[in-house]
Amino acid sequence: ASSGAHLTKYSNVTDPVAGQKLLIVDPAITPDAALFDYSITESVPMGTTLDGALDGIAHTFEAFCGAKSETYELLQKLAVTCLDLILENAPKLMSDPTNTEAREALGLATDLGGYAIMVGGTSGAHLTSFSLVDLAAHGAACGIMNPYYAVLYTPAIQPQMKVIGRVLKKYGFAAPDTEELSGRALTEAVAKGLIAFGKSIHAPTRLTDLDGFGEKHVQRILAAAKDPSLSMKLQNMPVPMTAEDVVPYMESVIRGAMDGDLSKILIKE
């Protein structure tokens, strides 16, 4: 399990031979209380810390993109606060790994991510990440995929893209005119902003950035997406899908993410 696991009903089991992760979802594993001393993260590699940050963004971003009317306001606050904390403090921590305040900020941000997925839920990027366990850490895999899935979700997430675009612009990762855009142009501008942040912390931003990625992973991803045990991720997408939609729609996302080409992604109206 990755960031926020100490707060949530989610865990997982990974088959290292098949290279596939599967979910455990049960309210019984939600703790009555949790204690996280963020200072213990000082001893872990910087890559692990930043992977947690990427996972925190993924949790709040995916939950916010899938928000219903009754949860929209709360998930917006969680997404904006999480992004603010991470975009401001990740660069500080890279410059000074002993910066206690920056480390605590990232810890709080990822805790908000855990809260977000208890209110909403994750979707496409998390689903794909489960098939990349032999190549990438969880947060990095989600961080690669969310910009590309956002384009797929374009018709359903325009208000969310305006909000996320504002935060990215605040930290110099999105163009000044992002909020004036609409439709696919807006979503692609936000996607490019998320990719720019990933590059700024030296994270992979394309599937081909992962050493060893190949066609077998594409087929593994598509096969897993059709697995009934993971159907909740398809159904939880802002543009809900079934196994029959995996090809061509989800496949177009994977092909686009392979070489960083947003134009390859098909949109399901």
Locations of regions flagged by a protein language model:
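C-terminal catalytic subdomain
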Residues: G120-A191, I195
